[in-house]
Amino acid sequence: MKTVAVLSKPSKPELSEIIPPLQEWLGQHGYEVIFDQQSAIYVSGIHGVERAKIAAMHPEFAIVLGGDGTLLSAARAVAPAGIPILAVNLGSLGFLTEVPLQDMYSTLERVIACNCPLDERTMLACDLIRDGQVLHSYTSLNDVVVNKSAIARLVGFDVSIDGRFVFNYKADGVIVATPTGSTAYSLAAGGPVLMPAVGAFQITPVCPHSLTHRPVVVPETATISIVVRSNGEAAFLTIDGQVGQPLKEGDEIVCRKADHAVKLLQMRQSFFKVLREKLKWGERE
């Protein structure tokens, strides 16, 4: 029997009215449903699966119910296995989760009929290196951020690209963003907007103590190294705004293109239409 995974945002009361009929609809169309632990609480007699274990069960595709944050978490869990994601917006912004709830079933019909465009999004792979050893490895759909933690002190950074020193500065932080992440934290820090298909990453400083430092766009083939220097004990590594690790002076964060991409089942709206509708881009009033 074909299987589909359902992953949802925790503590979302309206899911009690969404998930049971969704399970019934999928069953009528020949699908067995794998629920993550957040979704299973809305279905009687079902024990949910840890999100990290869903990929090993090889569902045909995954339905994500929530906002952009839910999608980011789900992407890190299922993208390595090449599982396509249909993201249904239950959040506030919904920049990535572009399918409205009222269009969920009609979009699912298109997915089942293999008539739904597949949009591949580049991911970042990130290694945290301490004392010459890889301490942790991560993947990210939006961004890798090194910034100050609780104490309001500037942190020093050395940035290299492909083994060549580029610059150092003191700042609140530095962002390495994918094209998808260019409309997230990097945008708020003054970084450029990249179309999702652009083969590039961007390095965006956060409040640098300088009159000259600007965001830099590099090819996706580049390897980006960030070494934490002064006040390193006040620095923190964050992946997609969700997973974090305190840093020490001398820690190195190495970012490169991940071996896998996120496959999004989408309605194929114009990227610039989404910018206008979600971020009010280009509006004069």
From Swiss-Prot:
Its main location: cytoplasm. It comes from Koribacter versatilis (strain Ellin345). Keywords: ATP-binding, Cytoplasm, Kinase, NAD, NADP, Nucleotide-binding, Transferase. Its cofactor is a divalent metal cation. It comes from the Bacteria. Gene3D superfamilies: Probable inorganic polyphosphate/atp-NAD kinase, domain 1 (3.40.50.10330), Probable inorganic polyphosphate/atp-NAD kinase, domain 2 (2.60.200.30). Involved in the regulation of the intracellular balance of NAD and NADP, and is a key enzyme in the biosynthesis of NADP. Catalyzes specifically the phosphorylation on 2'-hydroxyl of the adenosine moiety of NAD to yield NADP. GO terms for molecular function: ATP binding; metal ion binding; NAD binding; NAD+ kinase activity. This is NAD kinase. It is found in: Cytoplasm. The gene is nadK. It catalyses: NAD(+) + ATP = ADP + NADP(+) + H(+).
